[in-house]
Amino acid sequence: MQLHKFYFQGMMLPLLQTKVWKFLMSQIGNHAFMQKFVELLNSASPKLAVELIAPDAVFNSVITGREHTGPSGYLEILAALKAGFPDVRWELQELVGEGNVVAARFNISGTHLGEFQGIKPGGKEVRISAMNLYRLKSGKVVKEFNQFDNLSLLWQIGVYPPME
């Protein structure tokens, strides 16, 4: 068995090449990947999109209501969201991963300053949550499943009357 050095709170701990070691390394890798992915969500950088998304990745978007493929397709989704909420910010709240699957919970905030899903801007600030499940292959997203709190967003921008 191979011995690895793992540092925890400044102490070096020897770990054997075990399932525990592989699990720890996958968690560290998943966290680093998602930090970079949040950067993509907030910047809509084409360079990051190519780095993090496989060319044949598939995305079914509740934002646009259709399927998108690859880095350019994902950028279309982000552009549709930014068109309605130019100051949109994604914040990673929780992350769980196992092997090539990563689940992430986000808070999303922004101001409705542009048209979104056919709804004229009203200038209202919104804060919603999203749960996304990412399937990774060779360090890139190949599939995303998402649950975007669209109903709450529509309430907050005034499409539906406030809940009492």
Model-derived regions: residue spans:
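Cationic, low-complexity basic patches in intrinsically disordered or flexible, solvent-exposed regions
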Residues: L3-F6, F23
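C-terminal and inter-domain tail/linker signature
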Residues: G10-M12, L16-E164
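Short, low-complexity intrinsically disordered segments enriched in A/P/G/S/L with frequent Arg
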Residues: M1-L3, L13-P14
